[in-house]
């Protein structure tokens, strides 16, 4: 918390607000991180970890709900003005929402109402902890990106439920890290580079598999600027809640189009990794589009110790 407080103090000094993303990896948690067998909505094998995971008990589910509330309190202590709850991309809340990962036959699985139960409890806990002085934003999937996952029709119903719960805004994303990761990012994935930099010496077989059949394991999804725009507009038409756009925001024209289409804000990642001064250059008129090539070397070399060495290839 003290180190995060230094960060938020610096942000506030510049006149801006600070937000932090809160989430739980669920079945994508590495055993080396938690020191035990990872847990998720259902049991099974997760290739991303890679390990077998166990199904959460009801006590663990409710305890995790309480942990989200505690995390909000820590965020307040650290000086954050907003929390973003990650309910997409195949992390824990998403694992409960998606029929691809939720195979339960109790009140936490089955129909959509049951699959939303964990999410609803988490959001209520978060809203209670946030009180009136912190904003609550939720990142959701508009679609998971695979046949047995969530599709747009169910995702709109999930978004409407979050609107009823009183969250302040939704971030509209898509994709499933353990099954359809390139739906999130789009563009090329330098498989051999990713395998080389993976700090997973115990799982040499996974690194070898990535080198041999990585393109089948992580198929490329073509990149285009503002690639989620058409889908996000369907959500804009069905919801009254403030929406935040994400996905392929590299060109000034697209940024203006998004803001003029009823979105209150947009998020960027790779454009800022490529050039941390990108927004200032836009404002000064020095450029109108990020030079990011979407080679995704920033993803392939994201493992600890390598983060500062990829910018030259972005």
List each model region and its residues.
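Flavin-dependent oxidoreductase catalytic cores
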Residues: 1-314
């Amino acid at each position: 918390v003290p180190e995060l407080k230094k960060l938020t103090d610096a942000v506030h000094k510049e006149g801006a607000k600070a937000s932090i993303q809160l989430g739980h990896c669920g079945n994508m948690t590495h055993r080396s991180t938690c020191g035990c067998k990872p847990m998720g909505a259902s049991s099974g094998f997760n290739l991303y970890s890679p390990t077998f995971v166990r199904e959460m008990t009801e006590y663990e589910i409710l305890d995790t709900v309480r942990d989200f509330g505690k995390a909000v309190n820590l965020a307040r202590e650290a000086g954050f003005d907003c929390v973003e709850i990650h309910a997409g991309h195949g992390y824990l809340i998403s694992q409960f929402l998606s029929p691809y990962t939720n195979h339960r036959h109790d009140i936490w699985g089955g129909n959509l109402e049951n699959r939303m139960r964990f999410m609803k409890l988490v959001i209520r806990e978060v809203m209670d902890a946030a009180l009136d002085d912190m904003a609550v934003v939720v990142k959701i999937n508009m679609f998971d990106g695979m046949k047995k996952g969530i599709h747009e029709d169910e995702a709109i119903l999930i978004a409407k439920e979050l609107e009823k719960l009183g969250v302040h805004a939704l971030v509209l994303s898509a994709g499933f890290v353990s099954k359809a990761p390139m739906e999130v990012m789009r563009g090329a994935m330098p498989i051999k580079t990713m395998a080389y930099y993976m700090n997973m010496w115990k799982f040499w077989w996974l690194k070898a598999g990535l080198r041999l059949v990585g393109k089948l394991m992580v198929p490329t999804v073509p990149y285009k600027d503002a690639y989620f725009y058409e889908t996000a507009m369907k959500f804009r038409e069905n919801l009254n809640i403030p929406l935040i756009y994400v996905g392929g925001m590299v060109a000034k024209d697209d940024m203006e189009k998004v803001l003029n289409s009823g979105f209150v804000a947009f998020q960027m990642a790779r454009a800022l990794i490529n050039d941390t001064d990108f927004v200032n250059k836009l404002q000064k008129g020095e450029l109108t589009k990020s030079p990011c090539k979407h080679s995704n070397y920033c993803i392939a070399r994201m493992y600890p110790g390598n983060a500062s060495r990829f910018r030259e290839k972005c």
